[in-house]
A protein has these predicted regions:
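Membrane-entry segments of alpha-helical transmembrane domains in multi-pass membrane proteins
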Residues: 1-9, 25-32, 80-98, 136-149, ...
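Transmembrane helix-loop-helix hairpins at membrane boundaries of multipass inner-membrane proteins
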Residues: 2-5, 21-125, 197-219, 271-273, ...
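N-terminal signal-anchor/start-transfer transmembrane helix
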Residues: 8-23, 104-105, 230, 234, ...
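Hydrophobic alpha-helical membrane-insertion segments
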Residues: 36-54, 184-193, 395-399, 472-487, ...
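Hydrophobic alpha-helical membrane-embedded segments
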Residues: 45-46, 356-358, 434-443, 515-535
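Aromatic-capped, Gly/Pro-kinked transmembrane alpha-helices
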Residues: 76-87, 489-506, 527-630
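Hydrophobic transmembrane alpha-helices and their helix-loop junctions in integral membrane proteins
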Residues: 105-146, 155-461, 468, 477-479, ...
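Hard-cation-handling environments
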Residues: 462-521
Length: 630
């Protein structure tokens, strides 16, 4: 399987070609090159998955871990070194399929969505870089290689979020995303260094005796790594960048939310899962609590947002919370429940990638039709965009957890694992699942039903998107319909052994009833007209509604801390010290040198008489000095 290195190198080659020679190409040619390369990458990924899983398990009954390519990149000292390579195991192969599929759909979709945009070639170059970075992250053979590509993912997202660099909001959003995730990544880097020092390796599978000897340092290292993952996955309170990241092109949002960018934290915990479960189970507990709180917070905020992309952004945050909860509850004393949590998390990552990409690309078609992100500019669009309407409905039903769509299977496995861990956790996550169904159908009815905005529609009649934009919708909708029937546990599990999925009928019945009730409530409130019931509720609970709309003022807290504390109390005194003390000292040296030069410039005047005076004065001074000393 040595050919797998091409899966990483082809997007890199596409980035270099489009980045260096793209401006000499026509936009259509640049798009064709980027899309063709991704099609080859996707085919190679599918063949890799087929070859890997069809080869079967080893004698121990697990899928083997393969490293078809590896090279020592940086020797550090002794046995410690950093390798670059390709690692194939069930979760990395699964992620290759996810990344290549979503990225290919985004590339095809962008041919229509970005047509006529300035910087079209640059856009496709950045997409190729982003794809290469995500692939490098998931096939990394060690934690340091993962960190290198982790940072490349951050750089790529910065470039794509700030693609419209003449737009102030996009520039600010790209800087915000970059800075917030850099703070979290500092914790990740410190954790990696602690881990490497005490474990004696950056490998994902170090020697057991080194970990035992390290004592409490390994849980500390893993906890710091989780901080980095929480930042990348937009967990509260490091979530503030993801909402503003919607300033980038909509296909970029699909790639960020559906592929590896925001699920990188989930993948990190899954990749290091044997270490978490063996040496830091308390960190996994905190992972579950942080995930549950984030899922609830984001679901409440999504219920009152009016921007279609921001509703989907908070939906992503909430769903990532579900994935982290599933990993966190895998510490259950019941081995079956523990394995179920891990498998359910990875299964939900897979299914979520497909229907969330479908939702964002569908949102792009809607924005393309009405030229607005606001739901107030929409309503009644099912008459004008039947294909987008149908595929968007499929995605909404999937994320709500309605049978037989993929979200039903993955979400119910998470809920089953939560109930096995703790009944309280199970009921909390069931309630959040109900909120998910409510806000998604609030969004659905606000876009496709309700009263039309005839004033806007008269000025610009909505229409269905071109074929390059609707084909990816149809493909992703088809995958969303059938993905739930994949025997996922046969391929991906916490220990590599086959895991047979058994639907808990009682949990499934409860979750379906909760989802159906939430959808019925959203239908009653939003389906027929412009939400008079919702307006009355918002007026009755105006304080809560305002707080949720303002995201419970967490952004304002950050604003206060940065401007009133960091800038006013720390940055301003440091700036004063730098300006008056450091610069003052340097200016004093310059003034002293200028003054000395002014005093002695006559020594080089060219006048022999002056030279004689200086000579006699110097001789007299030396004579007096000698007499004083003697």
């Amino acid at each position: 399987m040595e050919y797998t290195i091409l899966i990483l190198l082809l997007p890199l080659a596409s980035f270099l070609v489009l980045g260096l020679a793209g401006m000499k190409m026509r936009p259509a040619a640049a798009g064709a090159v980027g899309t063709a390369v991704l099609a080859v990458v996707a085919l190679l990924s599918y063949w890799t998955a087929f070859e890997y899983f069809s080869a079967g398990r080893d004698a121990a009954g697990v899928f083997p871990t393969l490293i078809p390519w590896n090279a020592v990149w940086l020797p550090i000292g002794g046995a410690l070194h950093i390798d670059l390579g390709i690692l194939l195991d069930p979760i990395s192969v699964m992620m290759l399929v996810v990344i290549s599929t979503v990225s290919l759909m985004v590339h095809i979709y962008s041919l229509g969505y970005m047509k006529g945009e300035r910087g079209f070639q640059r856009y496709y170059a950045f997409l190729s870089l982003f794809t290469m970075s995500m692939i490098g992250l998931v096939v990394a053979t060690n934690i340091f290689q993962m960190y290198l590509f982790w940072e490349l993912v951050g750089v790529s997202s910065y470039l794509l979020i700030g693609f419209y660099y003449t737009k102030k909001e996009a520039v600010a959003a790209s800087k915000k995303a970059f800075i917030v995730t850099r703070f979290a990544d500092l914790g990740f880097l410190i954790g990696i260094l602690i881990y490497g020092y005490y474990a004696g390796t950056f490998s994902f599978t170090p020697e057991t005796h080194a970990l035992v000897a390290a004592g409490a340092m390994i849980p500390l290292a893993l906890g710091l790594m989780f901080v980095g993952g929480a930042g990348k996955s937009a967990m509260v309170p490091l979530h503030i960048w993801l909402r503003d990241a919607m300033e980038g092109p909509t296909p970029v949002s699909a790639l960020i939310h559906a592929a590896t960018m925001v699920v990188a934290g989930v993948y990190l915990v899954a990749r290091m899962f044997p270490l978490f479960i063996g040496y830091a189970p308390e960190v996994l507990h905190w992972t579950a609590y942080v995930g549950a709180f984030t899922a609830f917070y984001a679901a409440v905020v999504a219920c009152v947002q009016s921007d279609i992309k921001r509703v989907l952004a908070f939906s992503t945050i909430s769903q990532i919370g579900f994935m982290l909860v599933a990993l966190g509850v895998s510490t259950s004393a019941d081995p079956h429940a523990g394995g179920l949590g891990y498998m359910a998390s990875m299964f939900h990552l897979f299914t979520h990638a497909m229907f969330k990409a479908l939702l964002f690309l569908g949102a792009g078609c809607i924005i393309h039709a009405v030229h607005s992100n606001e739901m107030s500019a929409m309503g009644g669009l099912r008459r004008y965009m039947p294909l987008t309407h149908l595929t968007f409905l499929v995605a909404c039903l999937a994320i709500a957890g309605i049978w037989p769509l993929s979200g039903f299977f993955s979400k119910d496995e998470i809920l089953t694992a939560c109930f096995a861990f703790s009944p309280v956790m199970g009921w909390v996550m069931t309630a959040i699942a109900g909120l998910t169904a409510f806000y998604m159908f609030r969004l659905y009815y606000g876009i496709f039903w309700g009263a039309e905005n005839r004033e806007l529609h008269a000025a610009h009649k909505p229409h269905e998107a071109p074929l390059t934009m609707t084909l990816p919708l149809v493909f992703l909708a088809a995958v969303t319909c059938v993905a739930g029937f994949i025997p996922f546990g046969e391929f991906v599990s916490s220990d590599g052994a086959p895991y047979v999925i058994h639907i808990d009928r009682s949990v499934a019945a409860v979750s379906l009833c909760v989802a159906a009730a939430a959808i019925a409530l959203a239908t009653w409130m939003y389906a027929r007209d412009r939400q008079p019931v919702a307006d009355r509720l918002a007026a009755t609970f105006s304080g809560l509604h305002r707080a949720a709309y303002r995201r419970f003022y967490i952004d304002e807290v950050y604003q206060f801390i940065t401007h009133r504390v960091i800038f006013a109390c720390i940055s301003t005194p440091i700036a004063w010290f730098d300006r008056h003390v450091v610069d003052g000292f340097m200016n004093l040296l310059a003034w002293g040198a200028n003054g000395a030069a002014w005093l002695i410039r006559d020594m080089q005047s060219g006048s022999v008489q002056r030279y004689c005076i200086w000579f006699l004065g110097g001789a007299l001074g030396l004579t007096i000095l000698i007499l004083l000393i003697c």
